[in-house]
Amino acid sequence: MALAHNLGFPRIGRDRELKKAQEAYWKGELDEAGLCAVGRGLRAAHWQAQKAAGIELLPVGDFAWYDQVLTHSLTFGVIPERFRAKDGAKPTLQTLFAMARGVSDSCCGGAHAQEMTKWFDTNYHYLVPEFTADQQFALSWEQLFEEVEEAKALGHAVKPVVIGPLTYLWLGKTKGADFDKLELLDRLLPLYDQILNRLAVQGVEWVQIDEPILALDLPQDWKNAYERVYNILQRAPLKKLIATYFGGLEDNLGLAANLPVDGLHIDLVRAPDQYPTILDRLPAYKVLSLGVVNGRNVWRCDLEKALEVLRHAHERLGDRLWVAPSCSLLHSPVDLAREDKLDDELKSWLAFAVQKCQEVALLAKAINQPEAADVVTVLAQSRAVQHRRATSPRIHKPAVQARVAAIKPADSQRATAFEQRIAKQRAGLDLPAFPTTTIGSFPQTSAIRLARQSFKQGKLTEADYVEAMHSEIRHAVEIQENLGLDVLVHGEAERNDMVEYFAEQLDGYVFTRFGWVQSYGSRCVKPAVIFGDLSRPKAMTVEWIKYAQGLTRKAMKGMLTGPVTMLMWSFPREDVTREVQARQLALAIRDEVVDLEAAGIKIVQIDEAAFREGLPLRRSAWPHYLEWATEAFRLCASDVRDETQIHTHMCYSEFNDVIESIAAMDADVITIETSRSDMELLEAFERFDYPNEIGPGVYDIHSPRVPTKEEMVKLLRKAAQRIPAERLWVNPDCGLKTRAWPETEAALVNMVAAARELRATA
């Protein structure tokens, strides 16, 4: 009998209950008992939803108060000194949130948050563990064991989920001194042994150990460590399933297949070609879990196609076949049943986490009971849906396809080199040394959100809505003028999300009402869905930016989202390549850039926050991606005069290893996230002479803590050691949408003061 199981479920809730509870707790409006009650309710609801869908073995340990990697850090006692209790007490929820969000100066002298970065190539973020050379590990957090008891008390068959020891170490960074993280392995392994043995005592039969780094290019010493680690852990008296995802095992396939564990999960959505080899190499005693339902997208599974593989696998494996999503459903919205505004045709093409669990269960049942009436019915429905989607005229637009086919190499090149452009731009803009600016968005107040919501619901006329947004723009411009910022932004009050705002105005996108996924902590995003060929029917931002520019003599930046970020932060099509979708988006944005320039806007920022996120996990696949991603950016930015300055912004982008490709984008100014990593990103400039201007972020906007002027001066001086002062800009790490006005103004006052101090001492 094939078994249906799941690797993980979204934790935020159908209506983002976790987000609302977290934020109420942080504001002091909900106590810890209330927060914990919300968590218990969500876990119970999610386990029941999976069970009702037909999942036989439920994941436990996939719930996290902020991030699953942070949960593991607390579990192992990997708590930086600045967050440790002075009396040596065990960590609390307050400790967890302090590590994630930082502590303000008014509390215990202040402590900056841990670094946050992308979870592999997804739009989820994790808190990077900080390891010291003398790192000690101790079991310090009981959450996993408590949740196992919760689930068992509710009558569920459970499969606890833990991040494997090698993946956990790989994800962390060394602090204080440079050393080999593998040196910590012998200190860490006893904790895994303790955890596994405690789970066995709790009656757990199977544990899922996530080792996604097996889909990466691993150094030989890390490969060598695998067999030793799992030889040690095999002593624990419970069965172990190693879960790999986000890519193929490739050169790690033999290693993974032969680890001394009881089962292996592989991702057949991202890497279907690995199936025949793994089937041949898998020892005869092992379970093979096949991830055939896409855990990272919203499209309904082609059940017949998946069944072809599963039927073949079942002939070989029999009861050793498990059926699963490709990865945790953390990256999928919760429940399509909540969507009551989508048209029936589009809705029939989609599946969210609950529906994906149903698909997994149906596939397992189709193997076990192929003649069952519900199996026959659902498979017939699936065939009909796949046919309609493949032939729908809503998807294919000949005019868009013809324009993409007509793209020439010259279309993605500026007319002159940077040296010639920057001379004209400096003359026209007349900015001081160390020019100050922000990344784009300002705080989204409840009044702003209410105005947008009322307009969408028809409760506010268009004229009243425009005046409400104009009022917010006037407020943002006035504050920036008073602060003394040099290049201004309009604040983006009219934008709900940097992708959704544009996607709403492009043909080829569709929107959900409840398609939320977690980005980090309480931050949820609702990715737009690309379902067809993409084009821009009319200008999207010009009137707002023109209005803002009319309020000031200073330069006002036009603010756009770049093609790669639009693609990476949307749920993309599966029927055409990402490259084709990026080119369609680039042409639409190119038209907007030209319109902004024609309206008198001298600076246009095209954000590519997700540029590095698109990199394939395997380095051998990087060149092709970097070629089309940089070409897409240049395509949307190149049809302007020399005098028009093109900016781009990248956040959470560790791009030391792709700095040449960043330079190939040929943006006149790039702003990047650097403060959390203490300007570590700038190490790239020691070996590569980046030719254009750069604004390394001088403070972390993800924390409510207000940085001091002295901290920012120190970071800028550090940056000036690697980048000529005449090419340095001064800016925050990212947009200020999620912050409140008081902390925003206080931080920007200090930032402007830091820039002025550098000008005075330059």
UniProtKB/Swiss-Prot annotation:
Encoding gene per record: metE
Cofactor info, note text: Binds 1 zinc ion per subunit.
Residues the entry annotates as binding 5-methyltetrahydropteroyltri-L-glutamate: R16, E17, L18, K19, K118, R523, C524, W569, E613
Highest taxon above the source species: Bacteria
Binding-site residues for Zn(2+), renumbered to this chain: H649, C651, E673, C734
Essential cofactor(s): Zn(2+)
Pfam families: Meth_synt_1, Meth_synt_2
Stored NCBIfam families: met_syn_B12ind, PRK05222.1
Gene Ontology molecular-function annotations: 5-methyltetrahydropteroyltriglutamate-homocysteine S-methyltransferase activity; zinc ion binding
PANTHER family reported for this sequence: 5-METHYLTETRAHYDROPTEROYLTRIGLUTAMATE--HOMOCYSTEINE METHYLTRANSFERASE
Family listed: Belongs to the vitamin-B12 independent methionine synthase family.
Listed pathway(s): Amino-acid biosynthesis; L-methionine biosynthesis via de novo pathway; L-methionine from L-homocysteine (MetE route): step 1/1
BP GO annotations: methionine biosynthetic process; methylation
Reactions it catalyzes: 5-methyltetrahydropteroyltri-L-glutamate + L-homocysteine = tetrahydropteroyltri-L-glutamate + L-methionine
EC number assigned by the record: 2.1.1.14
Record-listed L-methionine binding positions: I439, G440, S441, E492, D607
Binding site for L-homocysteine: I439, G440, S441, E492, D607
Residue positions of the active site: H702
The species this protein was found in: Pseudomonas entomophila (strain L48)
Name of the protein: 5-methyltetrahydropteroyltriglutamate--homocysteine methyltransferase
Alphabetized UniProt keyword annotations: Amino-acid biosynthesis, Metal-binding, Methionine biosynthesis, Methyltransferase, Repeat, Transferase, Zinc
Function statement: Catalyzes the transfer of a methyl group from 5-methyltetrahydrofolate to homocysteine resulting in methionine formation.
